[in-house]
Amino acid sequence: MKISVIIPSYKPKGYLWECLESLYNQTFPSNDFEILLVLNGCCEPYKSQIEEFLKGKDMCNVCLIQTNQLGVSNARNIGLDRAKGDYITFIDDDDYVSPSYLEELYEKALPDTISLCYPYAFNDGSPEIQLPYYITKAYDYCYCKLGKLRLSSKVRKYFSGPCMKLIPMNFIQERRFDVHFRNGEDVLFMFLISDQFLFLLFLHRMLFITDVIVRQVQRCLDEIFAKKQTMCFV
């Protein structure tokens, strides 16, 4: 297996279908990548809805995993434990990717290199209007000036999370996300594997699309509500 795509999901809404549809439309051969969709902290009706969608698309390369334990870090760890790919890419369930996302990242893949792509952010319902996004700004800085200027906090921002990258599994090995952190677990994980980085390769194409306002706010509200419910019943 060449690539494992790991998607954590909690009480997904319609945006998950967009995410899965974008992976269904990949130009990269479907038998060369697997999708590990980890439904965490919930089960029905979401599990049945996902199974119905996958059946309709005949997406045989998707492995749906359900766990009652809530948490994006736990979900990603489950995906890593099950991953068979030589390379890993993480995608949030409210983001989607261009048809050539996997193909173009893999074309530049090397065992000692992380391939990175250009993120495009917009508000829900207005994809034609690109919004300012700190990750995009960090990418532009890295792509245009990294070879001329010293490393700075602007560069580090791009590595604050695992998405928008194709990471060699040999970088990760047995390292996992720390489930004890409520915030900053992405940063810690990237720091843990940073000792393996030798080269970075930037693809200056819009391959990763993220909705930075409406969907992320809704996801945060869902997670806060879930935590409150847990606190009430414990």
Go through the PLM ranges and name each one:
Residues 67-83:
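Glycine-rich, basic loop-to-helix element that forms the pyrophosphate-binding segment
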Residues 88:
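Short aromatic/hydrophobic "clamp" motif used to bind/position activated sugar donors
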Residues 93-107, 112-184, 188-200, 210-224:
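Donor-binding/catalytic cores of nucleotide-activated saccharide
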Residues 46, 72, 76, 101:
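Conserved donor sugar-nucleotide recognition element shared by glycan-biosynthetic enzymes
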